[in-house]
A protein has these predicted regions:
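Conserved alpha/beta core of the MobA/IspD/sugar-nucleotide pyrophosphorylase nucleotidyltransferase superfamily
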Residues: 1, 164-236
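Nucleotide and nucleotide-moiety/phosphate-recognizing core
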Residues: 2-186, 193-194
Length: 236
């Protein structure tokens, strides 16, 4: 199936002391690199957030306006970048019929994305597909959505003046999506140092941040999916 991808790599990382999540490491790759791997197969990819550094050839980079305006504004910026993207011949390329929306702070999201793509091939996804974790929690930042419907949601939110600092659930309220159960742990995200420890995520060598060898997980403490909470959203 043909799809584009919008990868969200912004956010203030307030509970990580401002350490950018995109640069944290998991199994030898940054979380941004993990997200790019999860989105492999996309016809075009836009990374939304602060300067991501060197990206693979052809991957677009943009920023939500204003910066730190929330995930809904970031999705809007990513869609705009994809719509304006021109190919090697200088011609504007048509957008793909579906867009993968993916936050970069879920190191195991590749399993969830593969499950969504398999579900889309088995049955027409309509307005889109949204990942649902093993505990029943909906995760709109692992979603495969109709590009036309997603653009409609963004346009309507912009016309209402409700795009900035809006939740993704509010943005997608009028979109008919099918919920898809994804493998356990595939939507677990990094919002705190305890989360990082539980997921085997560390700071890069030589960077400023919490000592990755310091024990941070309390035995028996529950893992929570906190991407929504980190973006100021109500858990589903």
């Amino acid at each position: 199936m043909e799809f584009d991808a919008v990868i969200l790599s912004g956010g203030r990382s307030s509970r990580l002391g401002g350490v950018p999540k995109s640069g944290l490491m998991h199994d030898g790759a940054t979380l941004l690199e993990r997200a790019l791997q999860a989105a492999q197969g996309a016809a075009a990819i836009a990374v939304v957030g602060p300067d991501p550094g060197t990206l693979p050839e052809g991957v677009l980079s943009c920023r939500e306006d204003p910066p730190f305006a929330g995930p809904a504004a970031a999705i809007a910026a990513g869609l705009t970048a994809l719509e304006r993207h021109r190919g090697p011949d200088g011609r504007r390329r048509p957008v793909s019929p579906f867009t993968l929306v993916l936050a970069c702070d879920m190191p195991r999201a590749g399993d969830a994305v593969r499950t969504l793509l398999e579900a889309a091939r088995g049955e027409h996804p309509g307005g889109g597909l949204m990942a649902v974790a093993a505990d029943g929690r909906r995760q709109p930042l692992v979603g495969l959505y109709s590009t036309a419907e997603l653009q409609r949601c963004v346009t309507e939110a912009g016309q209402r003046g409700t795009l900035e600092n809006a939740s993704v659930f509010a943005l997608l309220a009028s979109l008919e999506v099918r919920e898809v159960n994804v493998p356990g742990g595939s939507t677990d995200d990094v919002d705190t140092w305890d989360d990082a420890s539980a997921l085997g995520v560390t700071v890069p060598p030589g960077s400023h941040g919490r000592n990755s060898h310091e024990p941070v997980t309390r035995p028996g403490s529950p893992r929570q999916n906190s991407t929504l909470e980190a973006n100021g959203e109500e858990p589903g």
